[in-house]
């Protein structure tokens, strides 16, 4: 960026309002009048307000002529000094949004073998050029784009441009900036330029799965592309790559079945992938030298290159990610992708900021970028063209990659209108796709009643939220390491646990409920963020031996899998995943983050228990009601005393094999005798960390419940 020396500065802050800053070092910052110059025309500005600042006098002026944004204007003071009229805060006004909103479907590139059309939205630019670089050539070709209505710039370039690299050169406020197309769908290594590709070469056959019926039928398993295969004993050859998931069969002589077959054996329904779109923090040429979770978005419509077999080949990452999703679908597993529309990696370097400076991000009352995300910038999703970009991006992932859902990072930054529009779009293109997100309240300049956060969940039916109340009631606070939840022996969390088990709905007068329906509650005790449960327990209950801690984690996981709502599981939770005590492993080495396949083998009995609980949940609809009415009709809590909580599911024969189900959660260290509700026999389905569907064991009247355990009984 070249520094422009100006005698004074003038900014268009509203469509008819100009702010002028005159330095006091000359004429004491005084001017009795200002003139707006446009081509050969001269128009007097009306001074509305004058304020003395430390080094400037600030004037607010109004113009009676319409300003054509994207045209060159000059402002002249009474002393004959001139400066260019810069684009200021006008771009963050509703009037600007209305005037320059473009609803076309052609942003980006449209490739044909004989020509390519380039379309860019850059309303504040006074000139736009495209820089083309032929493949395997150093020759650069420049073309000037033609400005059209609504701030659109367009050009059609003749010839077959497949494989050509391209970037835009955009002039705003006299400064030229080079940027990658934010609508690019293919890029060079490390995203230095967009690449023109042929869609015919990336068309893989899609595997149609029937629409997913109910969100509460889902069992979500969260994992990171690189983590899953990077361990030396993973049995996968393409370690850290998309391609690892397509290796069949994946097997290690030391740890048995691995890879995708292992996920399929677990019985989960959806795999949620940490971000797979292009991100910063890892050099795609040498990915082994750094690690990152992927929450540093660079380009939103391009797969990350560090997971590709050949990041230099723009087709590689696209085809390999598509093949990964196709392979999952072949195995009747669905794919949710983690999307990060709340911020960019570095605001100043982003394509958004270079092409339309100041538009795509929120600013505070002082005009400074807001930082509710904690990473230096907040995406302004409420602005029309930001809203459109997000919806266009969602549509791209649905139609091009055939994903089955989206997890929205820091969703509380986004606005409710955008999230509901996404829900409508997704329902149209992929009925049954799941939308879930982090509904935390964040300090961003958007009205509270417009934020897509958990306290506004009832305004967003059909969108699910990570339920931190569930997490804290079972495990204990994430932010207070020594706070213990029910599974860690805290009997004071029993009331909160009842709310968690009932889907966090309006279950009784004591709890007004977070959600309209249980389909909005994502129930979890751990995720990629913060300590794993195993690592928290190493600090929180360090005095307890390992066997007791295993029982506590198994109790916690059983609650997640038997509660009303959507169960969410962190990959490796089934074998007590550890990150060696690291609380925030977002850039820690593979040895901290990898999926430790040796633990899977070491804790094979516990993994089998995990599988059994999943099968139990899937076998009976009473564990996964989709409406609050069903929960209120069938769920009661007949016993709540000390370390014990009993749930009863009544009259549920229409949902599965058993008419009555009892679930007992026990967090105490002593065996307890529990009286059963009637004199008839009960099938023992879950007992002593084993799951059985064959009714090998039956009980009547009472049952002995062992320390820190879960018991499930069924009656016809």
Residue ranges of predicted features:
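Substrate-binding/active-site clefts of carbohydrate-active enzymes
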Residues: 226-401, 411-414, 418-430, 434
């Amino acid at each position: 960026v070249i520094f422009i020396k100006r005698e004074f500065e003038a900014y268009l802050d509203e469509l008819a309002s100009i702010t002028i800053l005159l330095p006091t070092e000359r004429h004491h910052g005084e001017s009795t009048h200002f003139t707006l110059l446009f081509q050969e025309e001269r128009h007097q500005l009306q001074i509305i307000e004058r304020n003395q600042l430390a080094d400037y006098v600030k004037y607010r002026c109004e113009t009676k002529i319409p300003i054509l944004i994207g045209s060159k204007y000059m402002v002249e003071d009474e002393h004959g000094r001139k400066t260019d009229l810069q684009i200021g805060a006008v771009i963050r006004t509703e009037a600007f949004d209305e005037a320059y909103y473009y609803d076309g479907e052609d942003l980006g590139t449209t490739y044909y073998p004989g020509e390519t059309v380039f379309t860019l939205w850059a309303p504040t630019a006074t000139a736009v050029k495209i820089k083309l670089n032929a493949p395997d050539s150093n020759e650069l070709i420049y073309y000037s784009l033609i400005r059209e209505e609504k701030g659109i710039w367009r050009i059609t370039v003749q010839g077959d441009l497949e494989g050509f690299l391209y970037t835009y050169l955009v002039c705003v406020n006299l400064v030229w900036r080079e940027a990658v197309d934010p609508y690019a769908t293919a890029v060079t290594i490390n995203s230095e330029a967009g690449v023109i590709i042929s869609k015919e070469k990336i068309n893989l056959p899609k595997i149609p799965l029937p629409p997913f019926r109910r969100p509460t039928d889902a069992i979500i398993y969260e994992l990171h592309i690189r983590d899953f295969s990077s361990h030396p004993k993973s049995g996968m050859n393409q370690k850290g790559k998309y391609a690892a998931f397509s290796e069949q069969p994946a097997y290690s002589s030391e740890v048995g079945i691995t890879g995708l077959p292992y996920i399929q054996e677990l019985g989960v329904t959806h795999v949620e992938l940490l971000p797979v779109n292009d991100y910063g923090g890892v050099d795609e040429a040498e990915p082994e030298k750094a690690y990152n979770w992927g929450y540093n978005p660079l380009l939103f419509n391009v797969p990350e290159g560090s997971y590709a077999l050949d990041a230099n080949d723009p087709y590689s990452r696209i085809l390999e990610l598509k093949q990964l999703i196709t392979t999952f679908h072949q195995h009747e597993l669905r794919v949710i992708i983690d999307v990060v529309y709340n911020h960019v990696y570095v605001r100043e370097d982003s394509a958004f900021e270079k092409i339309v400076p100041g538009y795509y991000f929120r600013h505070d009352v002082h005009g400074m970028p807001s930082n509710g995300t904690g990473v230096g910038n907040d995406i302004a999703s409420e602005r029309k063209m930001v809203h459109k970009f997000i919806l266009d991006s969602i549509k791209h992932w649905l139609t091009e990659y055939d994903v089955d859902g989206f997890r929205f990072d820091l969703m509380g930054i986004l606005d409710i209108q955008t999230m509901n529009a996404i829900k409508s779009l997704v329902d149209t293109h992929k009925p049954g796709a799941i939308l879930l997100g982090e509904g935390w309240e964040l300090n961003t300049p958007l009205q509270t009643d417009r934020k897509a956060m958990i306290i506004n969940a009832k305004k967003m039916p059909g969108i699910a939220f990570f339920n931190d109340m569930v997490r804290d009631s079972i495990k204990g606070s994430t932010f207070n390491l020594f706070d213990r939840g029910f599974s860690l022996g805290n009997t004071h969390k029993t009331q909160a646990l009842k709310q968690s088990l009932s889907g966090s709905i309006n279950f009784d007068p004591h709890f007004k409920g977070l959600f309209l329906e249980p389909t909005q509650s994502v129930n979890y005790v751990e995720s990629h963020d913060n300590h794993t449960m195993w690592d928290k327990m190493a600090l929180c209950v360090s005095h307890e031996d390992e066997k007791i801690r295993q029982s506590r984690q198994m109790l916690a996981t059983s609650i997640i899998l038997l509660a009303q709502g959507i169960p969410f599981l962190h990959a490796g939770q089934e074998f007590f995943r550890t990150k060696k005590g690291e609380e925030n492993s977002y850039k820690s080495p593979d040895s901290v983050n990898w999926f430790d396949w040796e633990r899977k083998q070491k804790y094979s009995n516990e993994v089998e228990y995990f599988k059994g609980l999943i099968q139990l949940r899937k076998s009976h609809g009473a564990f996964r009601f989709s409406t609050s009415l069903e929960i209120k009709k069938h769920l009661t809590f007949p016993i709540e005393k000390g370390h014990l909580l009993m749930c009863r599911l009544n009259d549920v024969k229409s949902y599965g094999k058993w008419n009555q189900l009892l679930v007992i959660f026990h967090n105490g260290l002593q065996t307890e005798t529990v009286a059963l509700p009637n004199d008839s026999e009960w099938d023992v389905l879950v007992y002593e960390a084993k799951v059985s569907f064959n009714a090998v064991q039956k009980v009547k009247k009472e049952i002995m419940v062992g320390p820190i355990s879960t018991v499930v009984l069924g009656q016809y």
